[in-house]
Amino acid sequence: MKAAGTDTMKNEIKYEKSELELMTTYQLREICRREKIMNGVIHPLDKEELIQSIMRYMGKRQDFFICDKKKEGEERVEEFLKKTRIVIKPCKELYCQSQILAYEGLSIEYYDGYTIPYKKELSGTNAFLMGSDMTLCAILNLKEHGGRQEKLYLTKAAELETRETQRKDYRIFCMGRQTSESLYHLYYGEHTILPEHIEVYSIPLIDFVVRKPVTLMLPMAIDFGSVNTTAGVYLDSAYFENVGEQAAVKNCRENEINYTAFEDGNGESMLLPSVIGVLAVEEEDYKLLFGYDAIRLANASYVDEGFCVFYDVKRWIGEYEKEEEIVDRQGRRRLVKRAEILRRFFLYIIRKTENRFKCRISQVHISSPVKQKHYFRRMFREILPEYMTDQETMLDEGMAVLYNTISNMLEQETLEENEEYEALIIDCGGGTTDLCSYRFRIQDRRAAYKIYMETAYENGDTDFGGNNLTYRIMQVLKIALVRAKGNQNVSSVKEILEYMDTDIYRFIDSHGVKAFYQYLEQEYQKAEETLPTRFADFERYNRSEYYKVKNNFYTLFNTAEQIKKLFYGKVGALEVTVTSEQKEQRENTVLLDKWKLSFWKGNSLTVEKMIPEVMMNYFEIELLLSGEIYGIVQKFMEELYHSGRIQDFSFIKLTGQSCKIDLFKDALKEFVPGRMIQFRKRANIDAADFELKMTCVDGALKYLRDRKYGLADIHLNNGKAVLPYRINAYTHNGKEVVLVDGFKDWDTAGTISRNMEDLILPLYLKNTDGEEHCRFQYVCRQEDFSQKSYEEIEAVYGSHILQKETDSIENGDVKFFVWAEQEEWGFQVVPVYCEMDELYLGKAEFFSFESDNWVNSFFDGKK
């Protein structure tokens, strides 16, 4: 044996779970004693608990894949393979496709279809594609996929280089796990003992081709959602003429929209969870995980072990300049700007798309939120400048959905030329719900359609989305578990639902949504005493208890999300069972990790291994969610209904994944005839259904295609938005003054006066029902003022500060001018002071309507 470097690695024994499961309880205790795992020595643990303890501290890292670029790593491996003695092991049953096609800077994935027959000793190892002159042409990984043991997939990381040789004679060296791990450590420059000779299987390859990726003509489209994000590209004939015959592109559709698929652990999904996890925080950099990988990171953590996962990151748009503290499992911390984290998230999606379609993306169209379109576009310009497309032609989410509808109606020939149509679109996503009105008409010209589109924001709820529905299910799940564990102080789920089983719509009309859920909220708070989930309350406790409670919340919330998908992702799922025991294969079962939940026992939080089985049925969930859904529909539709405006609309379209729940359509029928509602729900829909979520990507790509190919001359216009907020203040004698009224003339400045001192002006953000959301403070100091003439003030602020208003300011007083900024989704405060009949202008300050200070988050540790 020979050593690479001067030191040798400590020879640690690591254990695989499959090996431990074959051992007796006595053998497992002996391992704990030998490895000084005190938890397994002191406490009388059973076999399952002993395996859990050993895997936590001495579990073997399953795979040592070479999957990122390391300086001089390939050179070290190539030099070793050239110099060492290689023994070829005979194995006729191992073979591969005769040719492998790779693309510069792109990965090879399982969907590319390169495989070898399954051989257990090769699973989870590295393989080395060599030229006849022993040039290292590519480093590959051998992976299982989908739990099937029929074949192993050849994959390659995008960061690793590929090269051809002059002679078309290649072979793939496959080797056992121990040899593969040795070369892994050699590649990364770690001190390791290298063998004098290695044994490999040699699989011949006729050709290895490396090509340059095709650059797409049209931008890629991304729909960034609160819960899920989707992406797609339009692949024209030119793409198919230039790309190679990869297995991945054989399934692509020519001159059609193709979606980016993401691996979810069980297969592929067109939906990527908008979740970001922290894998490692190092001195020079940090590593993040995205989507399903981030969720797996949280699920894989031990119950009292730290993890850092960000959900609902779309809310960061409003304050993307802020910093977030990221923490890895080792407790290493770092402050990182939200903009940088979001940039990496979008780059991950772009890279996944490039790898999937063997292409290069030069431009990206990300549909902006309707109410924050200008703010979002500025953020996009800053974080992804290299992918910028023409911002003036970028669609917001509502426009994209509408254009998809128009395009489909043109194909079906159901639109009348020059007739003006009005549409109302309700977009209920994972975190927010928006209501927008649209007007459009078309003209069929000789060369192209001429399409006129106008949009106006009508209403919205920052605090309602699919997460609200998941949270309601989580509340019932938590109460059911607490009752099953013996806490009879909490009412049963049956008792709670019986209380709610009334004429729901009329009850909410009279008493509101909060009153409808009052009993549920009361019992949920009682359940906190047994099964805590408010991890923010544990920040002053020790680290172990904090993470136990944090695990409680995320375990229950993710389980509730699975339950929701089973009920509303499958027709006929009338009952769902939640259990920790994997018994016989039962349909509609959600497995709850028995090592994840901690209950109060006396003064300590104890992990419960025996989790009681809980059953939920469809009718209970319908009753539970009806109040939330009717409440949001009533909020949006009631004013339109009573004013008669609802009759002006040609159709009402429901979009967003949450809208596939029939309860939305039922609630809408209280205000409009059912035939006005465009509600897509197909028979035999399953959990992978994503049609409602894809309408935004479809519309954006059809819009980009029609503009690029001259099929349509499209004119976009933004109408005046309705702002669902009011800004109020109080005069010196306590009289309330409305400074900004979002449902009226909100772009005219409201004013309020004070006597000039170093003063603080409190401002109150209220919703249309008069409920206070947030308080702002404008701090006014004399040194911030500078003398200005009215003409100078007018040059800066125009009609927002009128001369008749400044003329009325008395000496010694300051008048505050407050007006809304639609494009920035916030409001400005500008003070003007008068002294000795001279005007002095103070500093302007902008406040965002929606900020972290008041917007409801289900992931802040207060649920």
Predicted regions and their residues:
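Phosphate/pyrophosphate-binding loops at sites that engage ATP/ADP/AMP, CoA/4′-phosphopantetheine
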Residues: 24, 349-363, 633-651
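Helical "lid/coupling" subdomains associated with nucleotide-phosphate turnover
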Residues: 342, 470-475, 479, 485, ...
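Flexible phosphate/Mg2+-sensing switch loops adjacent to catalytic phosphate-binding sites
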Residues: 237-271, 446-459, 680-685
